[in-house]
Regions:
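Contiguous beta-strand/loop segments that form the cofactor/metal-binding neighborhood of enzyme cores
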Residues: 185-256, 285-291, 295
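C-terminal helix-rich "cap/oligomerization" subdomain common to oxidoreductases
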Residues: 1-2, 60, 69-71, 220, ...
Length: 327
């Protein structure tokens, strides 16, 4: 049972905003309001989901005293400007990944959240899917022994259209911020501490964004991970997490619901299933509301920070910046 109903607003009306509206409806809630750069699109979205308020100007959402939580679902490069306004006005914020362009922006946002005593979090599905919490319990039991190696794949086939946002430098496109953030978040979930030694290879699209990336990471505990990313070569979204006494295979890991655990000694397998892929946004909403209520905070902003530090370091080593970082 939901103890308190919070007023959620969405900033943006794209695919994720639709998922959010549907997730709230599934929980017996409704979006309170919608803000969009184009009023007509906001009105169309509001009509579709029975939302009572559409703002004439996008900034009105930050000043509305009835709004408790804002979900930011706009392109990466717009996040920090909206985060500044939302947090400064005392709004709790759940922000679509990647939460910012770089670590400097994220540190600023965290400082603002702490100053204004509000919850800031990245909408990273991996941190909220039930399968991950069950796997964490298994790992913590010691049954699999110490972690040795993680292998991550995420290959997405995007049409080779350089006007597409995935290939647009002006819209903060590229493999790392769009899909790599999932792989790195999964790695951080299982690693006992953040990686400190990071090497990589990258190839760029004609627009200058990272199209293919290979990453090797190790941490002080000698846990190792490899990542293979592509925006123009399909790969299965599969994670293999290898321990001393067995390994975990996670399928469709960004919103995973099934894992196979194989034990090295005798080869026997356990199949673990938890949660449902289609309920990913419901799990995020539930955890965010728990954090806002002050009961428990399972938003893992510390993991988000570690992942952002990795992505920032990688892009610095590649000499790859976005226009906002050059001002």
């Amino acid at each position: 049972m939901i103890e308190k109903y919070y007023n959620w607003a969405t900033l943006g009306t794209g695919v994720i905003a639709n998922e959010l509206a549907q997730a709230l409806e599934a929980r017996g809630q409704k979006l309170y309001s919608v803000a969009n750069r184009t009023y007509d699109k906001g009105l169309e979205f509001a009509t579709k989901y029975g939302i009572q308020k559409v703002y004439d100007h996008i900034d009105q959402v930050f000043e509305d005293p009835e709004v408790d939580i804002i979900y930011i679902s706009t392109p990466h490069n717009t996040h920090i400007s909206f985060l500044r306004k939302a947090l400064a006005n005392g709004k709790h914020v759940l922000c679509e990944k990647s939460i910012t362009l770089n670590s400097t922006e994220l540190r600023e946002a965290i400082d603002l959240a702490e100053t204004n005593h509000v919850v800031l979090a990245e909408a990273m599905t991996i941190f909220h899917m039930p399968i991950y919490r069950q796997l964490k319990t298994l790992v913590d039991s010691g049954k699999l022994g110490p972690l040795k190696m993680i292998q991550m794949n995420f290959g997405s086939y995007k049409e080779y259209d350089m006007t597409n946002r995935f290939f647009s430098r002006d819209l903060a496109g590229g493999a790392l911020l769009d899909i790599g953030v999932y792989a790195l978040s999964c790695i951080r979930w299982f690693m006992s501490e953040a990686p400190h030694n990071i090497t990589s290879q990258v190839t760029f699209a004609p627009t200058g964004v990272d199209e293919q990336v290979g990453i090797l990471l190790t941490n002080p505990a000698n846990e190792m991970a490899t990542v293979s990313l592509s925006l123009h070569a399909k790969q299965p979204k599969r994670a293999t997490i290898a321990y001393d006494k067995g390994y975990i295979e996670l399928f469709e890991y960004p919103r995973g619901q099934k894992a196979v655990i194989t034990y090295t000694e005798d080869g026997h397998q356990d199949i673990l299933e938890a949660g449902k892929t289609e309920n990913a946004l419901q799990y995020e909403v539930a955890d965010m509301e728990e954090a806002v209520s002050g009961k428990t905070n399972h938003m893992y902003l510390n993991y988000t920070k570690d992942v952002m530090d990795i992505m920032t370091q990688l892009r610095q080593e590649w000499g790859f910046t976005y226009p906002e970082e050059e001002k």
